Amino acid sequence: MVLNSPSDVVYEGIIGKWSSHTSFWTHLQKELPYQKFRLRDYLFSKLFRKPIPKDRSARIDISRLSSPILLLGSTVDEIWDASSAIDDIVSHYKGHHITFKKYHETGHMLTVAYQPNHRYRKDWRLLMKESKDSWLATIHFFDRHLKKW
């Protein structure tokens, strides 16, 4: 399993540009508990550079997961705190093989191989280096773990 910009909680869904007041995910056609969007928390996090408090009831339970996992995320993710999500997932994982990589230049959009995202307004070479590294890590991970099947 490869998780790119992972989250350790289920977030509220979005309709257009607005909160949906429903979970982003369902399981067996039932809405999962979710982290509600609160403008106050969002503004506080931006003004004081503090993480948004997590709703523990919205935590994604990975305790029974045993498959190999590769986590790829950014320490400067502008959408959610992927870095602390990686830490949380690693601390709760009970399986035998987990690998993670944290990048320091690119943000949330670490998704397109070999294409630096120009929305970050940083040196494209640094963005390209991280994009390439994440893609090669993904290929290596699949090569290592899918050959067994």
Predicted regions and their residues:
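Conserved serine/cysteine hydrolase catalytic core
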Residues: A58-L70, Y93, H97
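Conserved alpha/beta-hydrolase "acid-adjacent" motif
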Residues: E78-D88, T111
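Histidine-bearing beta->alpha loop at or near hydrolase active sites
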Residues: T75, Y103-L110, Y114-H118
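Active-site nucleophile elbow and catalytic-triad environment of alpha/beta-hydrolase enzymes
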Residues: S45-D61, T75
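Hydrolase active-site cap/lid region
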Residues: M1-F48
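Short beta-strand/loop motif that positions the catalytic acidic residue
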Residues: L65-S66, L71-D77, Y103
